[in-house]
Amino acid sequence: MEAFAVAIQSVITDSGFLAFTTGNAIMILVGLILLYLAFAKEFEPLLLGPIAFGCVLANIPRNGFEEGVMALISAGISQEIFPPLIFLGVGAMTDFGPLIANPKTLLLGAAAQIGVFVALGGAMMLGFTAQEAAAIGIIGGADGPTSIYLATKLAPHLLGAIAVAAYSYMSLVPLIQPPVMKLFTTQKEREIVMEQLREVTRFEKIVFPIISTIFISLLLPSITSLLGMLMLGNLFRESGVTDRLSDTSQNALINTVTIFLATGTGLTMSAEHFLSVQTLLIICLGLVAFIGGTAGGVLFGKLMNLVDGGKTNPLIGSAGVSAVPMAARVSQVVGAKANPGNFLLMHAMGPNVAGVIGTAVAAGTMLAMLSNH
């Protein structure tokens, strides 16, 4: 009987209830709200779902996650394993044809990165360090894996807040972008019908990822793992002889890695790291970054329209953020409302895929400038 009493006492002593805090309760509630948004409202469910459940798990006291599979999942983020693997799958799903057919749209992808640097400046004004500000600013690129990659490098203590902000705003692109697009364009500009893109050869599609990898990696070696895997996945897609590798990359592999990446990100959302004024500031700055990126792309689109004699519809500039293909679809929807005969989707895919490269380049630039400071 005494042994039984000791066993019961041991269970009670080791119970998480005794170590459960108000902070844990708040964060579990946050996780449940995110689960609701992910599954009931379909806000990036493939990503916010695992992030939210990881948040719940992280706030169970005495969970023993320092060992076992959860420790390995966390290591996959801290050792920068998962983001490049996600990029491999993204590359296998990406068609760079619209960008190759209209290379000037690369400039729109670059212009949309202005939101990154606007948020960076705002974060520094609010008292964040340069490294923290850079990690926050990259939210404006609308690229979750790159946001996680840069946060892991420069501000790992802010990873959870940055990831939640990035994926939340990515899911809200159809709500955030249209008002900004309409604010900076006229009805006449939104009605512009663009010429059909030329056909891109298979040779061009194979050469592009190779040349891009070599040139950009030599310029910014710190992003070679991200960019290299992106372009390798694209080579699987375009080579015509590696269909099995392409299929695995864009289906089984990316789905599996997404589970681990998102869950591991959620595991960083413990009460002591997440419950702070900084988190609220990060969420606000993320919105500023998204709006700034959209505005930057549209305004540069207006400039291109002036230079080429009215051939460019400025709406495609908003697709310069790298939320692929959601941002391009928003350009199509807004353009079709202005002119039902307008079809901007393929034109918008050029700056959209350019935004993927642009965000990686922006991250590499900030890494080169700040990683040793």
Residues of each region from the PLM?
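Hydrophobic transmembrane alpha-helices of multi-pass solute/ion transporters
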Residues: 6-19, 37-41, 53-81, 235-256, ...
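Structural signature of hydrophobic alpha-helical transmembrane segments
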Residues: 16-27, 71-86, 132-140, 167, ...
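Interfacial helix-loop-helix linkers and transmembrane-helix boundary segments
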Residues: 39-48, 67-73, 93-108, 242-251, ...
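Alpha-helical membrane segments and immediately flanking helix-loop junctions
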Residues: 75, 79-80, 87-93, 108-118, ...
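Entry/N-cap segments of selected transmembrane alpha helices
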Residues: 99-120, 270-297, 348-352
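Alpha-helical transmembrane segments
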Residues: 157-175, 285-293, 316-319
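Membrane-embedded hairpin module used as a gating/binding unit in multi-pass transport
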Residues: 168-241
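Transmembrane helical segments that form the transport core of multi-pass membrane transport proteins
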Residues: 213-300
